[in-house]
């Protein structure tokens, strides 16, 4: 019975130890070494995370002293700063691109950039949580905490890999868009130069004509221009004449209406004054007649 218990204990310890050991993995294509600064910075973050996943004695010691989270913070900031710088560099080359396409690509790239930053932040927070749990050790053994941390790190690592690959693809599309915009700009310049060359050839051909032909051509263009100006002037004069006639008619109508209003205002007043004046004269005459003495008769 004791032998059986011993075998079971050894088997359980071996299983816990096996969970802690990370499986060997090749270097992922998303963090391959390249010439782009942001990929180099992400590669340093990735290498450091692979080292943390070993959960060696040195790793556990630095986890408890917050050394690991501090290192990850620096690597995170370097990576996101490099991504932002590379994105700004590409935006300078996207000027010839249509604004709606440029806005869409920028929005997609910004979302992928945010996801990568959130993944790295989640890794750092999980390691900080492990540090707190190890310091507290509330009802759990160190082996259990390490096994759970190893499992979480494997999941976070896969998520980080997926979002890093997505960001890499978005940046590639962004770069292709910048290249296409630059090609369109070069094509537009080429077309403009060809147009200028064609105009120069036409001017050279015109210069090579005899003086008389050039004079006739200029005279013909000048006559055409004068006729056009004369026609425009006549049309304008006719418009002015019509406008003046309309103004005259309107003024006459307004004057007649005003005269009618004045007549309507003053005729009743004049008629009333006439009646009052006639009444006044009658009253005066009556008063004068009444006050005149009758001549006395002589005997």
Swiss-Prot record:
Coiled coil: none annotated. Residues 152-162 are annotated as: LDL and other lipoprotein receptors binding. InterPro entries: ApoA_E (IPR000074), Apolipoprotein_A1/A4/E (IPR050163). The keyword Metal-binding does not apply. It is found in: Secreted; Secreted, Extracellular space; Secreted, Extracellular space, Extracellular matrix; Extracellular vesicle. One of its GO terms (molecular function) is phosphatidylcholine-sterol O-acyltransferase activator activity. Residues 205-273 are annotated as: Lipid-binding and lipoprotein association. Residues 1-18 form the signal peptide. Residues 74-245 are annotated as: 8 X 22 AA approximate tandem repeats. Sequence repeats lie at residues 75-95, 96-117, 118-139, 140-161, 162-183, 184-206, 207-225, 224-242. It holds the Pfam family Apolipoprotein. It comes from the Eukaryota. The modification Methionine sulfoxide is found at residue 137. Residues 261-273 are annotated as: Specificity for association with VLDL. The modification Phosphoserine is found at residue 141. GO terms for cellular component: chylomicron; extracellular exosome; high-density lipoprotein particle; low-density lipoprotein particle; multivesicular body, internal vesicle; very-low-density lipoprotein particle. Belongs to the apolipoprotein A1/A4/E family. Homotetramer. May interact with ABCA1; functionally associated with ABCA1 in the biogenesis of HDLs. May interact with APP/A4 amyloid-beta peptide; the interaction is extremely stable in vitro but its physiological significance is unclear. May interact with MAPT. May interact with MAP2. In the cerebrospinal fluid, interacts with secreted SORL1. Interacts with PMEL; this allows the loading of PMEL luminal fragment on ILVs to induce fibril nucleation. APOE is an apolipoprotein, a protein associating with lipid particles, that mainly functions in lipoprotein-mediated lipid transport between organs via the plasma and interstitial fluids. APOE is a core component of plasma lipoproteins and is involved in their production, conversion and clearance. Apolipoproteins are amphipathic molecules that interact both with lipids of the lipoprotein particle core and the aqueous environment of the plasma. This is Apolipoprotein E. It comes from Ctenomys sociabilis.
């Amino acid at each position: 019975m004791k032998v059986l218990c011993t075998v079971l204990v050894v088997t359980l310890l071996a299983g816990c130890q096996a969970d802690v050991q990370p499986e060997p993995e090749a270097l992922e294509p998303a963090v391959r070494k390249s010439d782009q600064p942001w990929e180099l910075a992400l590669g340093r973050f990735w290498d450091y995370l692979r080292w943390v996943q070993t959960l060696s004695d040195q790793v556990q010691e630095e986890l408890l002293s917050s050394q690991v989270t501090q290192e990850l913070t620096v690597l995170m900031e370097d990576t996101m700063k490099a991504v932002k710088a590379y994105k700004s560099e590409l935006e300078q080359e996207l000027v010839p691109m249509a604004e709606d396409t440029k806005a869409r690509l920028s929005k997609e790239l910004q979302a992928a950039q945010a996801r990568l930053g959130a993944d790295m932040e989640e890794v750092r927070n999980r390691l900080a949580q492990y540090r707190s749990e190890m310091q507290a050790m509330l009802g759990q053994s160190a082996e259990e905490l390490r096994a759970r941390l190893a499992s979480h790190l494997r999941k976070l690592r896969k998520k980080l890999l997926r979002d890093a690959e997505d960001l890499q693809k978005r940046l590639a599309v962004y770069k292709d868009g910048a290249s296409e915009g630059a090609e369109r700009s070069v094509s537009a310049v080429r077309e403009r130069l060809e147009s200028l060359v064609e105009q120069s050839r036409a001017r050279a051909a015109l210069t090579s004509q005899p003086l008389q032909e050039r004079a006739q051509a200029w005279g013909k263009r000048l006559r055409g221009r004068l006729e056009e100006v004369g026609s425009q002037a006549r049309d304008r004069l006719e418009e002015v004449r019509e406008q003046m006639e309309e103004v005259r008619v309107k003024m006459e109508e307004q004057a007649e209406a005003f005269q009618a209003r004045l007549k309507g205002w003053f005729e009743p007043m004049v008629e009333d004054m006439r009646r009052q004046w006639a009444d006044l004269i009658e009253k005066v005459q009556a008063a004068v007649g009444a006050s005149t003495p009758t001549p006395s008769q002589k005997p």
